Each structure stands twice: as C-alpha cells, then as structure tokens.
Amino acid sequence: MNRILFHSLTIPPDQVSTGKLVADIASKFKEKNLNIKILASTPQYRFDSKSFSDNGLKKIGKNKYVSYYKNVEITHLSSSKRSFSRVKRFSQWINYHFKSIIYLTRNRKNFDTIFIFSYPPTMNLIAIFAKKILKKKTIYSIWELYPEIAQKLSELNSNILLNSFKKVDNFCLRTIDEVVVNSNEMKEYLINVRKINEEKITIIYHFANEKESPKSIEITKEIMYAGNLGTPQNVESFLDLFSLSKKQYKLTIYGSGSQYNSIFDRQSENITVNSFISRDELLQETKHIPFALVSLSPKITVEGFPGKTFDYLKMNKILIGYSNPKSSLANFIEKYKLGINISPNEDDLDSKLQILEDKDYIDQVYKNIKEINNKFANVDEVANQYIKLI
C-alpha cells in the first residue's frame, strides 16, 4: 500500500483555516483506508502551549509531540509562537525546515508519497529535498505565489534575493511530480510566465469543511471581517474608503496581525475592532451580519486567493471583495455572482453598496452561494481530486 505523508506548517488544534483544510483532506484519505499521516509544527498562531496536554498533544520526544485528528496521526515538531517580525518569522521557518529534514530523513522508509502544502513559501526547499534527495513522489500545493507577492508588497527589495528565490522556486516546480494551485489564473501564470509544464499543474479550489450556517434573518447594513490583519490584506486602505461612505454601514473586525494595533486605533461609531476569537464564537457573534469583507492588496492579482472566501460562503455571507478587478478573487466573485468587488482607489463605495440594497439581487446571490457550497466546498470532492494525484 502507498504510504502517504502530508507536510504542513499549521494543523489542528491550532485554529488556522488553512491547517484545518489539510487535516480535513487527510481525514478523507483515512476514510478511504489509505495509509496517511501528517507532519506539522506544534500550534504557534492562536494556541496556548501550556495547554498542549489538554488538547490532545502527547509529548513523545525532546522536540516532538503526537496527536490525532479524526483518526489521522499527527506528528508535531516543536515550534515557538509565531512572530510578526519578518526576520524572526524567517528564522522560525528555517528552524522548522531543519527539524523537518531530520524527521523526514530518519523516517524516509515509512512513506512513499509526500504532499507538501505551502505556506510558508520556503516549503519549496522541503519539496526539493523530498524529491531529489529522498527520491519520493512529491506533490506541492501552492496557495500563494512567492517571491511575486513579497516583491509587489515591497517586503523584499533585493534583486539578488528575489532572483535567487525565483530560481529555487522554479527549480522546485520543474523537479517535483505534481503542482496544485487554487485558481485558473495562477495556473496560467505558471505556464506563461514561469514556464512550468502544463501537464503537471492541477487546479483545486480552497474549501471550508464546515456545516453551512443559516443566512441572516434580516439584510442589515452590517459587514464583518475575520482573519489576518497584515499588509497583503490591505484592510487599512478599505477603512480609508469606508470612512468616506454616507451609507452608514457598520464594520466589525475580528483578527490579528502586523497591522492590528493601527487598525484598532481607528475604531469609531461605525468601526469595531476585536482580537481573534474561535470560529464557534465568531458564528454566534456574527449570525446577524449578512455581508463579509474579503480584502486583498491591489498589487496582488494571480499570486494569492484568500482561503477565508470559502469559509465566509459556508457562513452564508454575501461577499464584499476589495481587490484588483483583475485578481483571481474579483474574477471568482463576479463569475459566480457571489456579491460585489470594489476596486481600491477607483470605485465609489456607495454606488457599489447600493447594489446590495436590491432584494432580488440578494435573493439570487444566496442561491449562488448555495450552489458554490455544494460544488466547491465539498471535502469529499476535494479529497478525491488530491487522491487522483497519487
């Protein structure tokens, strides 16, 4: 039997949506009697390390823990709490990769196929190691494209580093067996710009393996945002535009990130900012809110697609995109008519919000959300697409 290993940075009980996606896919592999295990870090985003034992993590070595998610065994390599400093965060990645390489080398006879899920972008180093050194079938799932994002957001300004990283990334994508991307736009970019073989690229959308929540009873003038508050999300720019609106909508934010403090300082009668809360708490506190903001820097087009999009849809929220009209996000919202997309620095916000006051339009959007949840947010279908790559 083909022995399969999933390798991710985050995984439950850490409360990060991308980590839960990986775990849910793995659980479906397990249900189909596939030999599947997961290698990830200890919780580092939104989790108290002192309570590891209370949440199912059992220490089995100096820097190693084990837990189970729906009968899938997870090995956790010890990691410190996530830092918002770029230098410290990069150091955390490299430290994690070093521990991963040691683990993979020692356990190389225990798996045949490895699925590697990026973030962080330096996961490409592990993909190269798994294919070239360990000679394993390697499938790399890319959810964000680097160094393009770092370059566009001016997070990395050294041409030497940018070119070096791109060469390493291209070497990775040309060397491994299969590449998974989350949008057609990213696939086309890899083919036309990065010159990656089309035959090895598969499109698999993000999804949210959660029960669909009831829609809001009333269509009120309330918007929610839940997630990361960093540079790529561009939430501060949306607040600039939102503050000029005469529509008197209210925006409630839940999250954490490098821009949290500056966003928190912008609270007003119409803007409320809260720190991160669990998904169950979020559902309860936002069940009356009909709209959800998905914000993305206008510099990002094909390089990233916010995973929270599908989580919002499972929460039955009508999407308000704030992104480049040429972005994968904007194309997705408009193609499937799931709400509106606002072009940063160009569109008049109030004219777009006016669209959301049309009852017939809202009724149709809810029907479209239902269809998308059945089509793309089905974990069985997503898992089957991954299984076909083995």
Language-model features, listed with the residues they occupy:
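N-terminal subdomain of nucleotide-sugar transferases
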Residues: 1-62, 240-246, 380
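Nucleotide-sugar-dependent
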Residues: 233, 278-287, 292-313, 318-331
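Nucleotide-activated donor-binding/catalytic signature segment of Leloir-type glycosyltransferases, i.e.
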Residues: 220, 260-286
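Membrane-proximal helix-turn-helix segments that form the acceptor-binding/catalytic region
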Residues: 105, 122-125, 129-133, 160-179
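Carbohydrate-associated surface elements
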Residues: 185, 204-207
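A charged, aromatic-enriched C-terminal amphipathic alpha-helix characteristic of glycosyltransferases
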Residues: 344-351, 357-390
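A short, active-site helix/loop in glycosyltransferases that binds the activated sugar's phosphate group
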Residues: 166, 170-200, 330, 386
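Conserved donor-binding/catalytic core segment of Leloir-type glycosyltransferases
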Residues: 216-233, 239-243, 252
